């Protein structure tokens, strides 16, 4: 796997001004985007950031942390960068800070996955909606606040999938590509499917910083100038928008 990446990077010329930075990343498994295996950060996020660092001559040291601590350490200045991030995530806690965000580094859709026999049956049957703790099902907040939908949270994605497969929830609000990756590895590939007719959030993942906007500018230029490499990494990891395939 790494051999392919090295070959791709042969055409990238490192630039002057190399530095070492600490990048805070999520400890939770979220493949194909990212995971932590035996203490090592892996996945699309790792390969993308490594490719950028190689071009610039920077050194990225990855610090996997639980989601809540990751945000706190980032805002308290203990990390140089946070990935992934999004301007909407914990926006209230970020209000007092000047956070610099990159251009979109990866597409991400959060939506509802249901059993195939329930595909296209509408929001009315969603009485119990499962999601991962820390996730916000934005399109369904009004219904949750009104008591029309009961939100059930779990720490682990596999726990949520088990709930859906055992009809303990009517659907799960997650990233479809992450769910399909988990189901593929458990030989239950078609047991839950993304329902595009239900409300979903079409979004992106970004790199963020408090103190290094110049590196964010470098990263933005990398995403543009090395678009072919970035797309190769997306294809390699199966990263795409499930609605468009891109």
Stretch-by-stretch model annotation:
Residues 19-93, 153-154:
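Extracytoplasmic small-molecule ligand-binding "clamshell" domains
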Residues 27-29, 106-111, 185-223, 242-246:
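Periplasmic-binding protein-like
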Residues 49-55, 116-131, 135, 205-239:
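Extended ligand-binding regions for polar small-molecule ligands
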Residues 59, 136-155, 223-246:
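Ligand-binding clefts/hinges and TM-proximal coupling segments of bilobed small-molecule sensing domains
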Residues 62-126, 133, 137, 196-198:
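Acidic, polar ligand-binding/catalytic clefts
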Residues 68-82, 157-178, 185-186:
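Short helices/loops that flank or line small-molecule/ion binding pockets
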Residues 84-95, 170-200:
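A ligand-binding cleft/hinge motif common to bilobed small-molecule-binding domains
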């Amino acid at each position: 796997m790494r051999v392919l990446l090295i070959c791709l990077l042969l055409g990238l010329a490192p630039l002057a001004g190399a530095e070492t930075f600490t990048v805070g990343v999520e400890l939770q498994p979220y493949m194909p985007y990212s995971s932590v295996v035996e203490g090592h950060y892996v996945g699309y996020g790792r390969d993308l950031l490594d490719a950028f660092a190689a071009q610039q001559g920077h050194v990225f040291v990855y610090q996997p942390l639980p989601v809540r601590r990751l945000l706190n350490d980032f805002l308290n200045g203990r990390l140089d960068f946070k990935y992934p991030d999004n301007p909407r995530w914990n926006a209230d806690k970020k209000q007092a800070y000047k956070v610099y965000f990159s251009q979109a580094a990866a597409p991400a859709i959060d939506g509802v996955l249901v059993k195939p026999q329930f595909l296209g049956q509408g929001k009315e049957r969603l009485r119990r909606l499962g999601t991962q703790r820390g996730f916000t099902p934005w399109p369904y907040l009004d219904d949750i606040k009104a008591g029309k939908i009961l939100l059930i949270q779990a720490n682990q994605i596999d726990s949520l999938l088990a709930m859906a497969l055992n009809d303990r929830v009517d659907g799960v609000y997650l990233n479809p590509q992450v769910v399909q990756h988990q189901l593929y590895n458990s030989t239950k590939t078609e047991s839950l499917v993304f329902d595009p007719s239900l409300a979903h959030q079409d979004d992106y993942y970004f790199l963020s910083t408090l103190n290094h906007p110049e590196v964010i500018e470098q990263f933005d230029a990398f995403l543009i100038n090395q678009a072919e490499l970035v797309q190769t990494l997306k294809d390699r990891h199966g990263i795409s928008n499930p609605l468009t395939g891109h």
